[in-house]
Amino acid sequence: MTALKNDRFLRALLKQPVDVTPVWMMRQAGRYLPEYRASRAKAGDFMSLCMNPQFACEVTLQPLDRYPLDAAILFSDILTIPDAMGLGLYFETGEGPRFKKVISTPADIEALPIPDPQKDLGYVMDAVSTIRRELNGRVPLIGFSGSPWTLATYMVEGGSSKDFRKTKAMAYDNPQALHLLLDKLAQSVTSYLNGQILAGAQAVQIFDTWGGNLSAAAYQEFSLAYMRKIVSGLIREHEGRKVPVILFTKNGGLWLESIAEAGADALGLDWTCEIGDARRRVGDRVALQGNMDPTVLYAKPEAIRQEVARILASYGQGTGHVFNLGHGITPEVDPEHAGVFINAVHELSAQYHQ
């Protein structure tokens, strides 16, 4: 494989020295970009975009052609695993993701297969290798998956949910059944991420979007325990380099100390945490990724720069920080404002890496 021309993202995750703070954005390939909207129209719909490696590669690279980002992230969806388990993922306009089949009984869980990354999710592996080839060493490629708890909520609720009542009821009424589901998902996520690493992903992130909706005890039992299990089964070195792992629990700021013990290299932070406090709490155990409120991008350019400066100052001197938003960039953001954000990170962070 081609040598990396820009490896500061990987270096920061491993707490190695960098010249400036690296930056990328969750959902950086997305609807805020007119070129993404054109590709999606050409593909026909969201799933066709995900399932065609050429289209997935095209949209993954679009933000890199526009901005000096320090990493690319695979364009895909977190629900590819439940879809490969036979649940029939589809998207309703204005409704978000839905499943044709819903998991409601222990028998449903028993019947679920563990997908084979090559056979059942080959289109994702093909996308990873295509993107990696097209990147030609420009920046590292991030692979990703949803966390077992987050995937389970969609499978049990049948789609998005405000209160996760069916999944939480299962946690209290029939924890054995939920543990079986989470265990199958942990096995599936481990082999899926390892497949992405072997196909060319140079770092991986686990998105625990809904872990922060659990009580402290339930988070430990039903979310963190399974992420820990995944991390322990991941390929951590490939092509002569370490493959860093990032865990991101949205609204997980209360539990940073225990997440830092899960074995990952970095923790993603949402914008409700103060990054300087988070750094003091986790010490030197892990790098931190985040954590500007995505809606700051609706403000004027000078306000965006001020918030970038504030977050950089809060983190302070030295490496171990990957700048990102605290969640995905939203569709109505002006692409010019995203550019202001990215340039500000590089420009204003050099003083912290003397």
Swiss-Prot record:
The molecular function terms of the Gene Ontology recorded here are: uroporphyrinogen decarboxylase activity
NCBIfam families (UniProt xref): hemE
Chain positions recorded as substrate binding sites: 27-31, 77, 154, 209, 327
Q: Where in the cell is it found?
A: Cytoplasm
- Please give the Pfam families that the UniProt record associates with this protein: URO-D
Annotated signal peptide: none
Q: What does this protein do?
A: Catalyzes the decarboxylation of four acetate groups of uroporphyrinogen-III to yield coproporphyrinogen-III.
Query: What is annotated about its quaternary structure and interactions?
Result: Homodimer.
| Reactions listed under catalytic activity | uroporphyrinogen III + 4 H(+) = coproporphyrinogen III + 4 CO2
Which Gene Ontology cellular component terms are annotated?
Answer: cytosol
Per the record, the pathway is: Porphyrin-containing compound metabolism; protoporphyrin-IX biosynthesis; coproporphyrinogen-III from 5-aminolevulinate: step 4/4
Keyword set, alphabetical order: Cytoplasm, Decarboxylase, Lyase, Porphyrin biosynthesis
How is this protein named in the record? Uroporphyrinogen decarboxylase
Family of the protein in this entry:
Belongs to the uroporphyrinogen decarboxylase family.
List the residues marked with site Transition state stabilizer.
77
Query: Per its UniProt entry, what is the enzyme's top EC class, as one word?
Result: lyase
Q: Per the UniProt entry, what species is this protein from, by scientific name?
A: Pseudomonas putida (strain GB-1)
